[in-house]
Design a protein with these regions (language model features):
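Hydrophobic/aromatic residues within transmembrane alpha-helices
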Residues: 98, 110, 159-161
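Charged catalytic carboxylate motif
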Residues: 75, 79, 129, 136
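Residues that form or flank phosphate/diphosphate-binding pockets in enzymes
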Residues: 71, 106, 155
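Glycine- (often His-adjacent) and acidic-residue-rich active-site loop
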Residues: 28, 36, 92, 100-135, ...
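Conserved CoA-thioester-binding segment of acyl-CoA-metabolizing enzymes
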Residues: 2-101
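Secondary-structure boundary motif
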Residues: 86-89, 116, 139
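Short, flexible helix/strand-to-coil boundary loops that buttress conserved ligand/catalytic motifs
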Residues: 72-73, 109, 118, 141, ...
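Glycine-rich beta-to-alpha active-site loop
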Residues: 134-166
Length: 166
């Protein structure tokens, strides 16, 4: 009976902690509107963020946008958030390796998207969206390694700071 209660308490506590990790850090701050920025980011297509999960419990997250030296497009920012959510729910995960396709880790954000998001509120929303995603990545209960081969500029350098090792 005591073992059952302990397991139940542990699962409930673990569930609450994971729910807190998923919650946006910026709900309402600076008029942050996550749904609005998601719609705007969808307009900037290209590249992908791929996740493969090995049976050993190691995940490999690959930034794949070689045309722009793995720069984050709007859809890649959205995919990164989706992959982090997937990792938060991965029960068998032990570690995560983040890498870039080709000879560049990540050259930051796609400057065409940044330029198109020209007003200060949208810029603030994009920054908060990525900060929220990177904070959730940092809080994952996995050992994370940024495998930096080549350049890590701007948002790419920020991505490395969300990892345990680089």
């Amino acid at each position: 009976m005591a073992v059952f209660l302990w397991k139940n308490l542990f699962q409930t506590t673990k569930g609450r902690i994971l729910q807190q990790r998923r919650a946006s850090l910026y709900n309402g701050a600076h008029d942050y509107d996550e749904e609005l920025i998601k719609k705007k980011l969808q307009q900037f297509a290209g590249g992908s963020v791929n996740l493969s999960k090995e049976h050993s419990g190691i995940g490999i997250l690959t930034l794949n946008n070689s045309r722009l030296m793995n720069a984050f497009t709007g859809t890649m920012m959205l995919e990164l958030q989706e992959r982090v959510t997937e990792l938060e729910n991965w029960k068998d995960g032990k570690g995560l390796i983040i890498c870039g396709a080709g000879n560049t880790f990540c050259s930051g954000s796609d400057l065409n998207a940044v330029k198109a998001i020209s007003n200060s509120q949208d810029g603030m929303n994009m920054c908060m969206f990525m900060q929220n995603t990177l904070t959730r990545l940092m809080r994952l209960p996995l050992i994370s390694i940024a495998l930096v081969q080549g350049k890590a500029l701007g948002g790419g350098a920020e991505l490395t700071t969300a990892c345990d090792f680089s």
